[in-house]
């Protein structure tokens, strides 16, 4: 049976419902339309979302590109500014270097001119001497001929007589000429030496430090004083025994004074006491522990200070023990001048002067840096600091030139090389130029008082005034009891007393004043 026959039978049968069939057909059509519409709507929504996503992506890409462009422009501007700064710095350095070169060229030109003038003067003097010698020879020949004609003396006797006569006549002139040449040469050398020293001094500047023998430690409260002292004073006794300092506790609010002439001990005590106060546990066991830590910190600080000084001067090849001992000079002072700073300054001055006179600046710099290293050695070694320092650096492989320069910088031994003289000169410049060193106020007042007292102890002195920071003393004597000759003797006597009994850094000018005043009143 075919499908058409089957459909016909169904349609003819009573079971077939046309309304249901039509409904199914309409429902299927509507379902198809709904599915088609939904699919179309879905596709349209997908297209719209895709377009929106594409637009968002395009905008984000544009924003990212703009950010990248701005960042690149900022980096370019920063690089350009950095290059401009570097260019400006290099231009300034080039200008400074050019000025230095021009100044050096001017100095060389001046030296060339001075040498030319000296050579011309020498040539003129040589020509004058030759002319004088020729004139003397001609005169001698003429006199000899005349004498041979009128005398029975032989030629040798006449020659000897003429030689003695001419020698007597020319001796004074030659001596005066020699003195003039030597004075001019000495003056030129002094002028050049003064120029070199002034140029070296102007390139460095130093400031005095405070030469203290005590250190103040602040306390958080007054109760801490009792904890530092401890029961029956056991804590403070243990602290003083471990550090070797004196701890002074008085009525000063919230302060403790640490006193010691050894700056390293004083610094160790300060660090240990501050650590104990911060920790809060103060008893003999912790005191020993914190003092040991403070010693280690001081050793590290000294090593770092030595390395900084060596790096600053660009010196290579120093033994670590030398660097360590050199760093300890950081804690020592001489007339308010830090010894490590003084050593660095001496090294720089010696290097500059060596460069000016054509010597090796590195050798001079090395010797200048190490010249006072003996001051950092403890008191177990005997001898002056120059001798101790020379032996110490010899032990660690320094060259004989440097060793002799250190040993001879106070002229305790004979300088063997010119570098020893350079170190002496640089050390003197660093120590005595204005502002480099200064006495403590108490020592300054005491020295002025002793100076005036020495003058007042001489018979006939009425008043004495120390002026110019102790570099000059003016003595007023009684004109009734002191004559002019006695005033001169008083000046000499006071000079001898000052040299024998007083220590002073430079020179002291002595002025004795003897004057009489006569007053009349007209009525």
From Swiss-Prot:
SUPFAM superfamilies per UniProt: Eukaryotic type KH-domain (KH-domain type I), HD-domain/PDEase-like
EC number in record: 3.1.-.-
Principal cellular location given in the protein's record: membrane
Sequence ranges assigned to domain KH in this UniProt record: 213-276
Keywords: Cell membrane, Endonuclease, Hydrolase, Membrane, Nuclease, RNA-binding, Transmembrane, Transmembrane helix
Domain HD: 339-432
SMART domains: HDc (SM00471), KH (SM00322)
Membrane topology field: Single-pass membrane protein
Cell compartment(s), UniProt: Cell membrane
Family indicated by similarity: Belongs to the RNase Y family.
HAMAP family named in the record: RNase_Y
Protein name (record): Ribonuclease Y
Organism: Opitutus terrae (strain DSM 11246 / JCM 15787 / PB90-1)
């Amino acid at each position: 049976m075919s499908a058409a026959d089957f459909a016909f039978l169904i349609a003819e049968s009573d079971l077939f419902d046309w309304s249901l069939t039509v409904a199914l057909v309409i429902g299927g059509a509507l379902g198809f339309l709904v599915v088609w519409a939904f699919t179309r709507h879905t596709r349209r929504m997908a297209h719209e979302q895709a377009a929106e996503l594409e637009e968002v992506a395009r905008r984000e890409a544009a924003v990212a590109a703009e950010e990248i462009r701005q960042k690149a422009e900022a980096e370019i501007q920063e690089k350009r500014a950095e290059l401009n700064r570097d260019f400006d710095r290099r231009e300034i350095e080039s200008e400074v270097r050019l000025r230095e070169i021009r100044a050096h060229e001017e100095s060389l030109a001046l030296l060339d001119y001075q040498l030319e003038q000296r050579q011309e003067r020498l040539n003129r003097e040589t020509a004058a001497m030759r002319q004088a010698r020729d004139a003397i020879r001609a005169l001698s020949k003429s006199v000899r001929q005349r004498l041979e004609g009128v005398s029975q003396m032989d030629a040798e006797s006449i020659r000897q007589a003429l030689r003695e006569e001419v020698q007597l006549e020319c001796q004074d002139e030659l001596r005066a000429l020699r003195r003039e040449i030597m004075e001019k040469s000495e003056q030129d050398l002094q002028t050049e030496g003064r120029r070199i020293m002034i140029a070296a001094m102007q390139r460095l500047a130093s400031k005095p430090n405070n030469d203290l023998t005590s250190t103040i430690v602040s306390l958080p409260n007054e109760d801490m004083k009792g904890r530092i002292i401890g029961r029956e004073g056991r804590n403070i006794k243990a602290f003083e025994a471990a550090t070797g300092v004196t701890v002074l506790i008085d009525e000063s609010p919230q302060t403790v004074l640490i006193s010691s002439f050894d700056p390293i001990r004083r610094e160790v005590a300060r660090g240990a006491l501050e650590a104990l106060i911060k920790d809060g546990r103060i008893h003999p066991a912790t005191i020993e522990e914190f003092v040991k830590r403070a010693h280690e910190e001081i050793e590290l600080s000294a090593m770092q200070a030595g390395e900084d000084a060596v790096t600053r001067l660009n010196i290579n090849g120093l033994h670590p023990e030398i660097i360590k001992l050199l760093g300890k000079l950081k804690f020592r002072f001489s007339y308010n001048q830090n010894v490590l700073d003084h050593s660095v300054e001496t090294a720089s001055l010696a290097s500059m002067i060596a460069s000016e006179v054509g010597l090796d600046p590195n050798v001079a710099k090395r010797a200048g840096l190490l010249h006072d290293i003996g001051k950092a050695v403890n008191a177990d070694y005997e001898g002056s600091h120059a001798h101790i320092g020379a032996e110490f650096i010899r032990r660690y492989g320094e060259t004989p030139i440097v060793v002799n320069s250190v040993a001879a910088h106070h002229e305790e031994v004979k300088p063997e090389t010119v570098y020893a003289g350079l170190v002496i000169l640089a050390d003197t410049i660093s120590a005595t130029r204005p502002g480099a060193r200064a006495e403590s106020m108490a020592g300054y007042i005491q020295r002025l008082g002793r100076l005036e007292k020495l003058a007042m102890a001489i018979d006939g002195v009425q008043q004495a005034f120390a002026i110019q920071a102790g570099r000059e003393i003016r003595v007023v004597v009684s004109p009734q009891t002191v004559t002019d000759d006695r005033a001169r003797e008083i000046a000499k006597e006071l000079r001898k007393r000052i040299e024998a009994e007083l220590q002073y850094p430079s020179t002291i000018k002595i002025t004795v004043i003897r004057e009489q005043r006569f007053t009349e009143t007209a009525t």
